[in-house]
Amino acid sequence: MTAAHKLTYGQRAARFTNPAAKALLETMERKKSNLSVSVDVVKSADLLAIVDTVGPYICLIKTHVDVVEDFDSSLVTKLQALAEKHDFLIFEDRKFADIGNTVALQYSSGVHKIASWSHITNAHPVPGPSIISGLASVGQPLGRGLLLLAEMSTKGSLATGAYTEAAVQMARENRGFVIGFIAQRRMDGIGAPPGVNVEDEDFLVLTPGVGLDVKGDGMGQQYRTPKQVVQEDGCDVIIVGRGIYGKDPSKVEEIRRQAERYQAAGWAAYIERVNALV
């Protein structure tokens, strides 16, 4: 069977049973975009303004609603309206990291009620398989998808080696809900026990630390280009934040220009990858 990264996003959509994964891949194919914009701002108005500006160019918006100082339920309603308007999915970057019962409550309840509106979320595999079963008990009936943090883009990250292998094996055992990884390269086949057939494995790989202009941010973040991430390392979605919206969310035209620029670069890298493997 053809390896996942040799297929188009549209072809891969047909291989997934998880609704969130299927919807994301179909959106990527339809919009010709593998760009996710990470919006880390503290005011609702700024978040919504940035999302409305980048919406036409993205497949996925990544949020951290716990940093929004004036959060209320109306923000979620407005964010969902923008997702409908611009045809993208929502990924709340919650990075759950507790026991199953606790994460189930964090996912379903509290102020943010993440499962009710976020198509995709993520978790650290540190607690073991119970974190997946806890989140799945809430998210799977709603058609949500989970990403595991198998690798990180920060200097000195401990998510390497046996840790990464264990994360992939946990995903392999929970394919109905775990749709892929936050990682820096393809994870298909990594850490597979002897005798396990991994030829048809297909995990989505979403990759932060993507930049066209800088190599780092002075706080440990390391950047690679879309060509390196998508074409060379086979990742699926590039995650870009400050490289698009900078420090001033009011600069709408510059934000739009950067979003269009990253969309084009990410898609070109994907086309090169697929064409090179035909």
UniProtKB/Swiss-Prot annotation:
Which UniProt keywords are present, listed alphabetically?
A: Decarboxylase, Lyase, Pyrimidine biosynthesis
Q: Which reaction does it catalyse?
A: orotidine 5'-phosphate + H(+) = UMP + CO2
Q: Please name the InterPro entries in this protein's record.
A: Aldolase_TIM, OMPdecase, OMPdecase_AS, OMPdeCOase_dom, RibuloseP-bd_barrel
What the entry lists under CDD domains is as follows: OMP_decarboxylase_like
Q: Which GO terms describe its biological process?
A: 'de novo' pyrimidine nucleobase biosynthetic process; 'de novo' UMP biosynthetic process
Q: List the disulfide bonds.
A: none
Ligand binding (substrate)? 40, 62-64, 93-102, 223, 242
Q: Pathway membership of this protein?
A: Pyrimidine metabolism; UMP biosynthesis via de novo pathway; UMP from orotate: step 2/2
GO molecular function, one example? orotate phosphoribosyltransferase activity
As recorded in UniProt, its EC number(s) are 4.1.1.23
- The reply on keyword Cell cycle is no
The record places the active site at: 95 (proton donor)
The record's section on PANTHER family has: OROTATE PHOSPHORIBOSYLTRANSFERASE, URIDINE 5'-MONOPHOSPHATE SYNTHASE
Family listed? Belongs to the OMP decarboxylase family.
The name under which this protein is listed is Orotidine 5'-phosphate decarboxylase
Q: What is the primary gene name for this protein? A: URA1
